[in-house]
């Protein structure tokens, strides 16, 4: 209505500014192509797609795994653990302040979307950027077509109705085509770049997960699992946003601001350009400074979020302990305290965001009002047309879109970089337990020919001799565990390691597995220093039943198969029978497909230990360790199970090392090594240590346990005697009552 009532004062100033590239003035003024920015819909779709497909590690350690309904067969080869995905120019290990900087993270991230020797990725990135440029070219023409439509409507076409219809129709079609083309190119760009972005997220998450698996045990003992999984989760989401922001936000914003400033300067003079420049400068300075001030609130919220996740994970993992000690309210209060810190930080984030948005809107609205006033003055004086006024309005509003995104993108970019900070810190953690370059595999003596030597008493030809030479080690420099310890575990024999608590028994297992490196000395297996062989070959040849059986939240079948991933179902059922799990499994409704629960909490401790033994037997390792492996079993089951395992080990000539507190379980060992205060104080067989050294530490431990057992048996005998006496008393009372009843009945009959 407004346009119809406008009367042109001077027809001569009417100028048709043709869209690119049809008119020289415009084609000269606009030399940078840009793309229409994300609409709210496309932005949310892209972000949600990125977020939903991000890899979450938390599911690996904290979430409930999905049950598997069908067992694997031998026809499927075991999945091979791939090494971390490498770009040829990966960053060096180690953490430093420069590596943890934002520039380092962005540089590392760029390598994931532009990897060397990956032409497919590069082609996709180039196509996506080309579509970005094409969409920007179409998008910038939309306000020019709209201006020409308005100016055309203000010309008297009374005598040229046909020409008017043709011109207006062409401009309207061009307007609609340019707008639709810009949106279409933007969506195509999103679709093509999506695989690049998601692949980059997968690469970073995978490399981080593999890095965590390769970290030493001390690292994991000093970290909380909830914080690690939350760092990976937030970091992958941050990568998704940073990639979309850098490729589709920062570059288009820069192009769009440059184009609009150039158009205003060329067509409408320096005053409009100066106003635009001052607005951009004030807007950017305000946004950057305010966002830098708000960053500390986001960091506080992240720390509180990690703390809440750790409390929740600890409470759920130790669910039984919480219930046993009736401490639900205590755990809930701890969780609520962490949530309160997160709430306080989140409120600060929200209020500071409101301040930031208000300031940004004030700056932009002030600039828009001033520019509209200048444009109306130009229309009034006849220097500008109504179409020019509309063009200025649309260009400034078109500038408002990237300006609004500039604020939100900068805020989200800073937040995403904070979220990525912990993720990249994990990637740059130094690995303490390393192999030497080109480390050879561990090769055992006579490894392939040990089944035909039943009459050979020379154990040197058997595989699996372990020798400690002057080994010293401590978890902390001020608390040594092993002090110049030297001993030999002969190949093919059953050897027991005993001693008081804290003497270093379980530490020996960790050192043989190279979970830690020793401070001095050497550990040899068949004469080979374990620090100079590959970790994979070392751990492949060693099996263990630990004190606390680690089980996955999976089926019984898959937990046993974990000992050897290529094992067939028949082999698994055979070891199930050997460890006497078949009766239990037969009584379960789902059999071997029964889910054992988080950390195996749905089965008993003894059943978990037998499952761990089945896993060990399936692995068929030539060197085996038992760390209090039967502590949760009753005496009858323990003896039957140990008899079966001894038979298997004897047939296969396996080196068997047992760590035990209950000395009766290792009395038949070929050799017993006694530790005390980190040193080997005694060695020998059970009878040698008792008879030849009656005052030995082993003899003292044995006598203490035997006396306790005797006292226990006597107590049991006393209890049984008391029960028998009570029973006799009850029987006597019952007989007396029956006699009285009989006499009374007889008297009544008489």
From Swiss-Prot:
Q: Keyword Transmembrane helix, does the record have it?
A: yes
Per the record, which residues fall in region Disordered?
A: 43-100, 437-462
PROSITE patterns documented for this protein: ABC_TM1F, ABC_TRANSPORTER_1, ABC_TRANSPORTER_2
Q: Could you read off the lineage of the organism from its UniProt record?
A: Eukaryota, Fungi, Dikarya, Ascomycota, Saccharomycotina
Origin: domain of life: Eukaryota
Per the entry, what span does the transit peptide take up? Answer: 1-16
List all membrane-crossing ranges.
125-146, 170-193, 243-266, 268-288, 355-373, 389-410
Name the top EC class: translocase
Gene label:
ATM1
- GO terms for biological process, alphabetical: intracellular iron ion homeostasis; transmembrane transport
Query: Annotated Gene Ontology MF terms?
Result: ABC-type transporter activity; ATP binding; ATP hydrolysis activity; ATPase-coupled transmembrane transporter activity
In this protein, which residues make up the domain named ABC transmembrane type-1?
125-415
Gene source species: Candida albicans (strain SC5314 / ATCC MYA-2876)
EC?
7.-.-.-
Matching CDD domains: ABC_6TM_ATM1_ABCB7
Q: What is this protein called?
A: Iron-sulfur clusters transporter ATM1, mitochondrial
What's the protein's topology in the membrane? Multi-pass membrane protein
